């Protein structure tokens, strides 16, 4: 059973969080976008460092492309706020992040964002859940990821610099430099690693 809560749809990998259910969610969202006329504007898709997150994001995007939605694929694991920022920065109607946030390692999930990079409300997620649960897996249209890239349906993006610049613009970096503090940081295999290397 697919059900979006306040933090998105989260479930145990291999139980409710399966490839077929991921594809159903993608198809339900894609068809909503087609009905709204926002399919050509596109969607930003990102993923964290959890087990299977990149693969899940690929499965999701293959359906979006197959259903006729343009995809901007963040081609490097990233923090959830980076996808939210990118939805706003690129003026996109939707974004998704493959993550289960703070849940145990056996979970994964999908967070949905709407225009402005906001968390999707129940007005969006309830109809998507309902449609996804009613879909027959065989009715879902899938386009191979590499084929979709070649066809321009999926485009790789790296919004890291724009995201980090937006954060650093709010920080007095010179004051930090003048203090020359010693900082010990352990990203704990988390998604902050790529941003920290960039900074």
Predicted regions and their residues:
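Residues that form or flank phosphate/diphosphate-binding pockets in enzymes
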Residues: 20, 55, 105, 191-194
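Ferredoxin-reductase
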Residues: 38-118
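An N-terminal, well-structured beta->alpha segment
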Residues: 1-67, 93-94, 147-183
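Short C-terminal domain-edge/linker segments immediately following a structured domain
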Residues: 33-35, 74-76, 126-131
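Glycine-rich loops and low-complexity Gly/Arg-rich segments
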Residues: 28-30, 68-71, 97-99, 120-124, ...
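Gly/Ser/Thr-enriched, mixed-charge loops and adjacent short helices
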Residues: 108-199
